[in-house]
Amino acid sequence: MSNCSNQDCHSAKDIKFLEIKHLNGPNIWTYRPTLEATVDIGELEDYPSDKIPGFYERLSQWLPSLIEHRCSYEERGGFLRRVQEGTWPCHILEHVTLELQNLAGMKGGFGRARETSVRGVYKVALSAWHAEITTAALHSARELVLAAMNFQQSSNPSYDVEGAINHLRDLVDSLWLGPSTACIVDAAIAHNIPATRLI
């Protein structure tokens, strides 16, 4: 017999951020600004995506643009194929964060999820041209992924994707570079010329 009530057992299936750091410059992941999150998935280590009923369907319905993520298969739909075959929450968190940033108007591009020596604890690294925006996208991605897992067994699980994207768009509009400055910065970065916002 289990030692916890149904609700307690489900609440143990969580994604917790132990630490979030903004690495503003060359780092162990890349030469560009990066957000590095230390993430504890606890019991979710035992729940790859293919073992969660309805997860793939909800995720691909809520974020259909994930079809463009190539992932390790190096082909359109590669990431969603990984989700169907079974991948872990931090890998999914990485891709969902990048896609939410992209849909909000701040392209990301780089992402990695790597195990640490502690079971269930991962490092997730993401392109972070603006730390506050990427951090907000990471938190929204966590909420979306947990809602798609539906461990509360809701008869109609949902997540306000449009609301999350609109919130991130507001942050991009108020904190990120305007279109002309962004083009200049993009060109500088393409030529390995560092750029830092001075506000």
Language model regions located:
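Preference for protein termini
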Residues: 1-199
